[in-house]
Amino acid sequence: MLLKYRVPSLPYDWHCDCRPNNGLAKSTLPLEDAQRTIGLLRLHAAEWHIDPHKIGVLGFSAGGYLVAEISTDFARRLYEPVDAADKGSCRPDFAVGVYPGHLWIGDETYSLNPNVPVTRQTPPTFLLQAENDKVDGVNQSVAYYIALKKAGVPVEMHLYAQGGHAFGLRRTTLPVTGWPQLVETWLGTIGMIPAN
């Protein structure tokens, strides 16, 4: 399922100051949409022929931040329940963050944005980024990786020298083009799909 989530209509600076108490309002709309979507997938799993215990999230850039958010903020719904879809778990079973942003607060110790409090219950995570990403620098993934490792969460990270930002699924001559196969292999190693 593809989620097109709501974003705040406020003026937004993509070079966001992610430090706590930065004076910027935090919107819960994207996270609410992610929580609701996972609930709907689980509610309709039999009807849609999907395994309710193999539901994951994948996001690019700001969507990568949403991946981290739903992976760490799933204990309670941020909205009033609508129906039975909101009674089950909205914790993803795995997470893939591709050049995620807004995870590192910019310090020298790679402190994680406090809006993504990693715990042992955070799902297994795959991170991917290019070192020459000028939008969301590699420190975003590194900070999240360190927090996941400290919490004992299974995590795999791949850094590429070239690829920039927003390489997505485009075929290029760069090694980063092969990242979907790495994710597929990883999904097999964590039991989400049959191992190759």
Question: What would you call each of these model-derived segments?
Answer:
Residues 1, 52-54, 91-94, 122-125, ...:
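Loop/turn elements at helix/coil->beta-strand transitions in domains of secreted/extracellular proteins
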Residues 1-50, 164, 169-175:
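Serine-hydrolase catalytic machinery in alpha/beta-hydrolase-like enzymes
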Residues 121, 127-129, 133:
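Short beta-strand/loop motif that positions the catalytic acidic residue
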Residues 142-196:
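C-terminal catalytic histidine-bearing segment of alpha/beta-hydrolase fold enzymes
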Residues 101, 131-134, 162-164:
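Acidic beta-to-alpha connecting loop that harbors the catalytic carboxylate
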Residues 4, 58, 96-99, 128, ...:
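Alpha/beta-hydrolase-fold catalytic nucleophile elbow
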Residues 134-140:
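Conserved alpha/beta-hydrolase "acid-adjacent" motif
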Residues 29-120:
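Primarily recognizes the serine-hydrolase "nucleophile elbow" in alpha/beta-hydrolase
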